[in-house]
C-alpha cells in the first residue's frame, strides 16, 4: 500500500490518428522511452499506461492509445480498445500534425463533448515545418502558430480554434513545446484533483469516534486490509477523527467498552445484518461500499436505481460489474451472496451476468438492473461514464452496498448519514 492507488490518479489519454507522434509525446512528457516509436503506422496496439508526478497536480496516469484511424480486422479491434479508454479519462490530449483535422479528430471531439471531458489539441511535428526552431518556449509557440498558419491557411487554423480549447504546438522529436503542454495539462485537469475529496470525514466532526468493522474472510488479502478500508482510515485521520477497527464478532464488546458512543459505524456490507443488530439505533451506520457509491459514483442516482429492485420480474437479467479481476472462492459477494439475497428478497427467478475490469457490455438495454462494486480499483470517471450509458439506455444502476442493505431490509438506516440521499429516498417512497 506504499503507492497511490491508480484509481486516485488523474487519467490523461493521448489520442489521434496513426503516425502523428502520440507515443513520442508520451515519451517526451515522461522523459522515458515508454512507448515504441516507429515510422510504421499502427505501432501502438494495446493502450500503454505510465504514471508520473506532475507538480503541482501530483500523480497522474498517462494512457497512450492506438490510432483512431486504424484499419483491417485487427485495426478495428485496436480502435475498440481506444474507445474503451475514452470512458475512463479525466483529460484528453488530441494529437494531430500540421496537416490539420479531419473526420477522425472530429469524432474524438464529439465523444469528449458528450462526456463533458476536457481536452487539449496538440499540433505535433512542427520540426518538419522548420528544422531549427527558435529557442524559448514562448517564442516557439508564437513562431509555430505562424508557420502552421502559413502552411494551412486561415481556414484550417480557424477550424482548430473554433473549439475554444488550448492549442499547443510541439516537436516531440526536438522536445520543443513539451513544457507548454505540461502547463496546459495542469490548467485543464478537473479542479477536483487539486483538492481532497472526502470519503467519510465530512460525516463526523474532528475528535469524534468512528468504528470500522472489517471481517476477515477467505477472500481477505493476507497481511493487510483491503483498499477501501485503508483509504477510509486515512481520510478520517486527515480530519483528526478517532478511528477504531474491529471484526464483526468483537463489535458488541468494542461498543460496550466505549465511554462515549461512536458518531459513526462503517461496516463491510457483507456483515450488514449482524452489525445492524449489534449497533444501537441511535448510532449512525453505513458501509464502505455505500461510502464509495458517493466517492466514485453518484450516490443519489444509485439510490434511485436501488428502488428498481421492487420492479424485478422473473426472467429479468441483472448485470453485476466488478472493477478488479479476482479468483472467486467460497461465498463470493458478487457471484454468490448478492444473487442469493436479491432472489430471496424478490422471490423471482432472475438471471445474473458478470463483467470484470474495464469490460462493459455494448448493449445494456437487455438488463433490468446494473449492480456495480464499490469501484475502489478504478477511477471515478469510468464509473460516471457507465452511469451515463445506463441513463441513456434507461437502465437503473446501483452498487453492492446499497443492494445488500435494501435486500436485507436496512436500506433506510444505511442512508441516514447522507442527508441528501435520504431525502431523495423519502420523497420517492412516501
Language-model regions, residue ranges each:
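Redox- and metal-dependent alpha/beta enzyme cores, enriched for Fe-S-associated oxidoreductases
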Residues: 294-347, 353-359, 364
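Conserved Switch II/interswitch segment of TRAFAC-class P-loop GTPases
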Residues: 70, 86-107, 116-130
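Short, charged N-terminal beta->alpha structural module
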Residues: 24, 28, 212, 219-235, ...
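Canonical P-loop GTPase G-domain recognition
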Residues: 118-120, 125-133, 139-198, 202, ...
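G-domain G4 guanine-recognition motif of GTPases
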Residues: 65, 96-99, 120-131, 168-176, ...
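Conserved G1/Walker A P-loop phosphate-binding module
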Residues: 1-76, 84-85
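C-terminal functional extensions of proteins
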Residues: 314, 337, 345, 362, ...
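An anion/phosphate-binding loop that grips the pyrophosphate of nucleotide cofactors and donors
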Residues: 89, 262, 367
